[in-house]
Amino acid sequence: MSDCHPVLLPEGPFSREQAVAVTTAYRNVLIEDDQGTHFRLVIRNAGGQLRWRCWNFEPDAGKQLNSYLASEGILRQ
């Protein structure tokens, strides 16, 4: 897995395109509560339990999610 590079978000709000890039890269990251322009990006553990979630428009959403991606994210192979 040394050739796999994590996909991260900008530290602030993020776009749907950025969220889709992350959900494509990680098996345990999903888009939920989709309201069109606003949605939550959710990280779940291997058992399906919620680890963290943020609305895409929150001022520090990406920063919070990136820390959980680093520790909880499961990259697709």
From Swiss-Prot:
Similarity comment: family membership: Belongs to the UPF0401 family.
Name under which the protein is recorded: UPF0401 protein UTI89_C4989
Species this protein is from: Escherichia coli (strain UTI89 / UPEC)
